[in-house]
């Protein structure tokens, strides 16, 4: 496909506006399209397809084709340069990684796409900033919690963090209140079991419920 990705600043704006990245993992391309459409109907219009899935590239292609400009579609679990290249060739608008890989960031930059590296420590944040990262994934978030994120923003007050891993309706508002710009949500909004059972209405309901749980809580900008 190799479609031109949405400009990085626009992707960042869409993520901040939506306050949530819905993570699709364990779906066939057909399931991903139906789930993605339902999630978008529920208000979750920033989607990520995990490269752990063997047909992730096809899922990204299909989502871009079917959902059009109404959604931003990225690739997740991007840990290698080859994975980054395959995802961008499939049409990914952004790369969401669990860790910090200079080659992944460089590959995204060369293609005009946004790379969101994963960080956990101040040293990793410093390295990511030096590489030009404008948005970072705090992973894994659950073992550390919102208080850790808030402490991380002390020396980095302009840092844009997206906590991911164990984030659901019970703790997402706290992360935003602590200073996150958005959160990454997996099975709490995109459970592959629902697709296997053909219950796609649950995706729309879960997305709407998740966003409703955030209330008026705004992430940092």
Where are these predicted regions, by residue range?
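Active-site phosphate/pyrophosphate- and oxyanion-stabilizing loops and adjacent acidic/basic residues
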Residues: 61, 150-151
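Glycine-rich beta-to-alpha transition loops that act as phosphate-gripper elements at the mouths
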Residues: 25-27, 53, 75-81, 97-101, ...
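Catalytic cores of alpha/beta
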Residues: 80-90, 123-131, 167-183
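Glycine-enriched alpha-helix->loop->beta-strand junction motifs that scaffold or abut catalytic
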Residues: 40-45, 67-70, 89-95, 110-116, ...
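Glycine-rich phosphate-binding active-site loops on the catalytic face of alpha/beta enzymes
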Residues: 94-107, 138-146, 172, 178-201
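Conserved N-terminal beta1-alpha1 strand-loop-helix module at the mouth
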Residues: 1-91, 110, 158, 169-170, ...
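Glycine/Thr-rich beta-alpha phosphate-binding loop at enzyme active sites
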Residues: 45-49, 88-90, 110-111, 121-149, ...
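Aromatic/hydrophobic pocket-lining residues that form π-stacking "cages" and hydrophobic walls in ligand
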Residues: 35, 104, 108, 124
């Amino acid at each position: 496909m190799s479609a031109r990705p949405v400009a990085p600043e626009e992707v960042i704006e869409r993520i901040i506006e939506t306050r949530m990245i819905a993570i699709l993992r364990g779906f066939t391309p057909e399931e991903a399209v139906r789930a993605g459409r339902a999630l978008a109907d529920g208000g979750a219009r920033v989607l990520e397809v995990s490269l752990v899935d063997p047909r992730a590239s096809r899922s990204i292609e299909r989502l871009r084709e079917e959902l059009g400009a109404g959604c931003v579609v990225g690739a997740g679990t991007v840990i290698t340069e080859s994975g980054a290249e395959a995802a961008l060739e499939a049409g990914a608008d952004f790369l969401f990684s669990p860790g910090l890989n200079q080659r992944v960031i460089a590959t995204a930059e060369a293609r005009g796409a946004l790379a969101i590296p994963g960080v956990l420590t101040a040293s990793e944040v410093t390295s990511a900033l030096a590489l030009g990262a404008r948005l970072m994934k705090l992973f894994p978030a659950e073992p550390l919690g919102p208080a850790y994120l808030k402490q991380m923003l002390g020396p980095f007050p302009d840092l844009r963090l997206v906590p991911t891993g164990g984030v659901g309706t019970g703790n997402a508002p706290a992360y935003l209140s602590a200073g996150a710009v958005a959160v990454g949500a997996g099975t709490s909004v995109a459970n592959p079991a629902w697709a296997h059972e053909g219950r796609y209405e649950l995706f729309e309901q879960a997305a709407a419920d998740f966003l409703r749980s955030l209330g008026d809580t705004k992430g940092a900008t």
